[in-house]
Amino acid sequence: MKLRQAANHPQLIDPEYAHDSGKFDEVIQTIETIVAGRHKVLVFSSFVKHLDLLRTHLESTGVGFAYLTGSRTQRQREEAVKMFQNKQSCSLFLISLKAGGVGLNLTAADYVFILDPWWNPASEMQALNRAHRIGQENRVFVYRFISNNTIEEKIQKLQERKRELAETFVTSNNPLRSLSEKEMLELFA
């Protein structure tokens, strides 16, 4: 887990780290560009501490945002959704991947950021589906932020392999015959 956190921002594993993070800086720059165009963005991370770093930065810049993690009450959750959906000044919705996986309809968003890849591609798809709902009138753009030469690239390859295995399983007449024991274990791991 520490390798995944370090790929996002070294400060996630070393609070005393006082230098820049290329990935974090890229996320901030991309947010500034998109928000300047009056777009709305869902920002997902599997690390609440990562969202907290982003939250601290946004508070210092005055960019309007909503925030949702698993620690929020149902009422806070509903208020955050309402604020993002209805207030033009609320440009971003920071959401922990697990908290945002179920029961959210966020059609005001036209951009989705995945700040860190998750081992299970289905979890990411659930997050992306928050913006792809009935009532969505905008085209939705997805940005996946992946740090080069890190564990994130390996996770991305694993996700692709799992998607391929799932596709084989779904489209084959008798999918179990075409999968080796190793592939079955990978699919359900």
Regions found by a protein language model. Name each.
Residues 76, 91-179:
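SF2 helicase/translocase ATPase core recognition
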Residues 1-104, 175, 181-189:
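Conserved Helicase C-terminal RecA-like lobe
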